[in-house]
């Protein structure tokens, strides 16, 4: 996606590390100053390319490159096309590699060292993997980036999937309010050195208060008022999510399922800009 470089460069402050990949201003090495408040609304949006169709994903990435901040590629696409497919679709476009690693520490560490070679802006793991796994993930991302001579991606933890409600958690033995579990996992991730979490819109304000202003909140479950909620139970509008304290928004079917994906993306951005 050659014109993706222009989209990525639109909101760049600098190149980080010794590699040549482009990264948004807020995506930097641990301890460096973040600047998410300086990003324009469109730069905060990552569009989920949840498809196994390579041509479709590539077309969406190309059409949206100048309209949003990046793309999210998950397990459906990755299982079908692997690393080469990711490179073909997301080359030059800021990438959220959403593979939600959750395994024993050594396995997760090895997977992340390999994932770093794809130069993602964000990668993620399940916070429920526990402290040892999370600490191994932090170390693996740093070492993998150094060894591969590329910038270190931001490492995020998944707290509780947006498709789950309190009844669902009870069925798998997690007792207590869902929001308490989300905060517990977010605090664990922060203590282990991760850069942020993936959380639902309903937990944004609570996690911002609990984890502070420099902890990245990547928020799926984003649905404009004119879009249907689908299978996610904890959703909100883009404007409300940013107002609550989200840093980045993941938008999927409201854009990719629209008759004109580019027009849908423009509509979301315009609504955000109108809200100021």
Question: Residue ranges of each PLM-predicted region?
Answer:
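Glycine-rich phosphate-binding active-site loops on the catalytic face of alpha/beta enzymes
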Residues: 120-130, 224, 234, 238-264
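Conserved anion-binding
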Residues: 41-42, 103, 107-113, 118-195, ...
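A C-terminal functional module that forms or caps the active site or interfaces directly
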Residues: 73, 83, 200-246, 250
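Acidic (Asp/Glu)-rich catalytic clusters
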Residues: 61-66, 84-92, 113-117, 141-143, ...
């Amino acid at each position: 996606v050659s014109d993706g470089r222009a989209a990525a460069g639109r909101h760049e402050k600098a190149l980080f590390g010794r590699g040549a990949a482009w990264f948004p201003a807020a995506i930097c090495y641990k301890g460096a100053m973040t600047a998410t408040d300086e990003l324009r609304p469109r730069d905060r949006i990552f569009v989920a390319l949840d498809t196994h169709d390579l041509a479709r994903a590539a077309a969406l990435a190309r059409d949206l490159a100048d309209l949003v901040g990046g793309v999210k590629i998950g397990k459906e696409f990755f299982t079908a096309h692997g690393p080469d497919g990711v490179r073909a679709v997301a080359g030059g476009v800021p990438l959220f590699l959403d593979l939600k690693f959750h395994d024993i520490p050594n396995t997760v560490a090895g997977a992340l060292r390999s994932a770093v070679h794809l130069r993602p802006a964000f990668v993620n793991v399940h916070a429920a993997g526990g402290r040892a796994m999370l600490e191994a993930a932090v170390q693996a991302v740093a070492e993998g980036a150094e060894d591969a001579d590329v910038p270190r991606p931001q490492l995020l933890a998944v707290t509780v999937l947006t498709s789950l409600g309190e009844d669902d958690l009870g069925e798998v033995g997690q007792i207590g309010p869902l929001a308490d579990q989300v905060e517990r996992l977010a605090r664990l991730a922060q203590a282990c050195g991760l850069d942020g979490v993936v959380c639902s819109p309903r937990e944004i304000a609570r996690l911002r208060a609990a984890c502070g202003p420099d902890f990245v909140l990547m928020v799926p479950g984003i649905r404009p008022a004119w879009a249907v909620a689908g299978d996610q139970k904890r959703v909100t509008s883009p404007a409300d999510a940013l107002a609550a304290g989200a840093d980045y928004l993941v938008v999927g079917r409201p854009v990719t399922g629209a008759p004109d994906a580019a027009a849908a993306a423009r509509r979301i951005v315009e609504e955000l800009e109108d809200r100021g």
